[in-house]
């Protein structure tokens, strides 16, 4: 029973201390992840365009 009280108390202190700190490092991490997602999206759009052109060339070559 005492362990549960200690655990809840420590979790509360941790939540308060993390809530008061500035989220600068978390924001930077989020921006990096967002940028990776944007690059992945852009690359997949380019690949789909190239694949469509290749399919058109193959269909034209077959007649």
UniProtKB/Swiss-Prot annotation:
Q: Where in the cell is it found?
A: Secreted
Family (UniProt): Belongs to the cecropin family.
- Database matches in InterPro entries: Cecropin, Cecropin_insect
| Primary localization | secreted
Q: Name one Pfam family in it.
A: Cecropin
**So what does this one do?**
Cecropins have lytic and antibacterial activity against several Gram-positive and Gram-negative bacteria.
UniProt GO cellular component terms: extracellular region; extracellular space
Q: Which gene encodes it?
A: CecB
UniProt keyword annotations, A-Z: Amidation, Antibiotic, Antimicrobial, Immunity, Innate immunity, Secreted, Signal
Species of origin: Drosophila mauritiana
Protein name per its UniProtKB record? Cecropin-B
Query: Which biological processes are named by the entry's GO terms?
Result: antibacterial humoral response; defense response to Gram-negative bacterium; defense response to Gram-positive bacterium; innate immune response
Question: Residue span of the signal peptide, if any?
Answer: 1-22
Q: Does the keyword Isomerase apply?
A: no
- The answer to whether the entry has keyword Signal is yes
Modified-residue entries (Arginine amide), positions:
62
């Amino acid at each position: 029973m005492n362990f549960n009280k200690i655990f809840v108390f420590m979790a509360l202190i941790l939540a308060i201390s993390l809530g008061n700190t500035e989220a600068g490092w978390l924001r930077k991490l989020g921006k990096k992840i967002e940028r990776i997602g944007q690059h992945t999206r852009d690359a997949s759009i380019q690949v789909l365009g190239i694949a469509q052109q290749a399919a058109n060339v193959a269909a034209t070559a077959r007649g």
